[in-house]
């Protein structure tokens, strides 16, 4: 097995160690391997390929980190065909929350989420993806 080196803030490392201890992992490497497999598998779900999807992406960042807000604005414009709606809110005193509602293909949503994940200084990124056609019956009710 290859050995890799990963840089992360001390606080995240402490959380990783605590998580490993609390959940019975043998160490950091096992946690990172499982997290990596889960991350890579998130958008490899064959049931979603070729279907129209909707997604919600939530990003939280420190309000003083203006580079993140600028990046979010840039991504919103760069992916205007994908972003159906966008909402910005101030939360918790020192934080901003950016919420994106997306509608598009698995590939386009994957690309968008990947670009957000690559944005430096975000605190949390959360998302969910659902097929639009699963709600077709609800839309037909008169």
UniProtKB/Swiss-Prot annotation:
InterPro entries: Acetolactate_synth/TF_NikR_C, ACT-like_dom_sf, Arc_rbn_hlx_hlx, CopG, CopG/NikR_regulator, Ni_resp_reg_NikR, Ribbon_hlx_hlx, TF_NikR_Ni-bd_C. It comes from the Archaea. One of its GO terms (molecular function) is DNA binding. Keywords: DNA-binding, Metal-binding, Nickel, Transcription, Transcription regulation. Its cofactor is Ni(2+). Coiled coil: none annotated. Ni(2+) binds at residues 77, 88, 90, 96. HAMAP family: NikR. Homotetramer. Transcriptional regulator. This is Putative nickel-responsive regulator. It comes from Halobacterium salinarum (strain ATCC 700922 / JCM 11081 / NRC-1).
């Amino acid at each position: 097995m290859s050995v890799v080196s990963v840089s992360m803030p001390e606080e995240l490392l402490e959380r990783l160690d605590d998580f490993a201890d609390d959940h019975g992992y043998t160490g950091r490497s096992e946690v990172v391997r499982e997290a990596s497999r889960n991350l890579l598998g998130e958008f490899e779900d064959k049931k979603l390929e070729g279907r129209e999807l909707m997604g919600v992406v939530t990003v939280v960042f420190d309000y003083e980190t203006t580079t993140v807000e600028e990046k979010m604005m840039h991504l919103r414009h760069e992916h205007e065909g994908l972003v159906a709606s966008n909402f910005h809110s101030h939360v918790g005193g020192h934080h901003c929350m950016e919420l994106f509602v997306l509608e598009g293909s698995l590939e386009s949503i994957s690309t968008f989420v990947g670009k957000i994940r690559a944005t430096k200084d975000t605190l949390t990124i959360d998302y969910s993806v659902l097929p639009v056609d699963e709600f077709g019956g609800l839309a037909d009710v008169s």
